[in-house]
Amino acid sequence: MIYFIFLQVVMVLVSVAFLTLLERKILGYIQLRKGPNKVGFLGILQPFSDGVKLFCKEVSLPLVSNFMPYLVAPVFSLFLSFFLWTLVPFISYGAKFNLSFLLVICAMSVSVYSIMVAGWSSNSKYSLLGSIRAGAQTISYEVSLIIIILSPLMLFKKLDLEGYLVKSSYVGWPLYLCLPLGLCWFTTILAETNRTPFDLAEGESELVSGFNTEYMGVGFALIMLSEYASILFMSLLFSVVFGSMSFLMFCLVVYSYLWSRGSYPRYRYDNLMHLCWKSLLPTSLMFLCFYWSLSQGG
């Protein structure tokens, strides 16, 4: 079992490497340029070159930082991302747990602590402010995300990924029957993973990055690896819940992640919170009541 989990982690790392290449290629064509095309054939080795460069950089600790939390936070964030991948239903040697959906929700809730600790332990006011706004954003959108996840689970009465996938494949669960809920889910996971147009946690186009301002080299690479691994997992979870684990839908959601980065400007923070509490939360509660009534009727 350990061998298969190790193999799975390696596959996720390779997928993340090529996801970064795909993102840079898509952004390049959106901005009418080529993107990376120098390292290897058509730039295919560019992510490995970037990885070697990042992991070979010198790690200099900020003088007034809290060293242990500063070093542990990126590792913990990456561990949580890999832990979620052990629950996916297509790995028969993965973790067997009857409440795997509940475990996914718990792991996503704990992930906010790595952001908070990373910003606080850097002992920089810019990192601290970035971690505070990232924590508030993540906690706010987790409320809507949990309600959205519970809506189809209540209909099928399954709390494990594998059982839900089997039952939904028998019944059929096309996205066009629940398009508003799918759109709410996609908007919420964009905010949950701190992606454009909700990338207020990083603010990469600003002069000061955010909670990862003081990170460099290995620490920065681990934070980025955990972010992109979470993107892949959220896309897979979307395809499991709404598309009976369709590979085409998984690719479409990943592409939509990357496309939104090249198409939309960043939201203002007050608009971000208004969208969560005044639009997504009432809509998700309405769907929760609707699916609960369907489950009671059946």
From Swiss-Prot:
Q: Where in the cell is it found?
A: Mitochondrion inner membrane
Q: What class of enzyme is it?
A: translocase
- Primary role: Core subunit of the mitochondrial membrane respiratory chain NADH dehydrogenase (Complex I) that is believed to belong to the minimal assembly required for catalysis. Complex I functions in the transfer of electrons from NADH to the respiratory chain. The immediate electron acceptor for the enzyme is believed to be ubiquinone.
Full protein name = NADH-ubiquinone oxidoreductase chain 1
Q: Which family does it belong to?
A: Belongs to the complex I subunit 1 family.
As recorded in Swiss-Prot or TrEMBL, the protein's gene is named: ND1
* Topology in the lipid bilayer: Multi-pass membrane protein
- Major site of localization recorded for this protein: mitochondrion
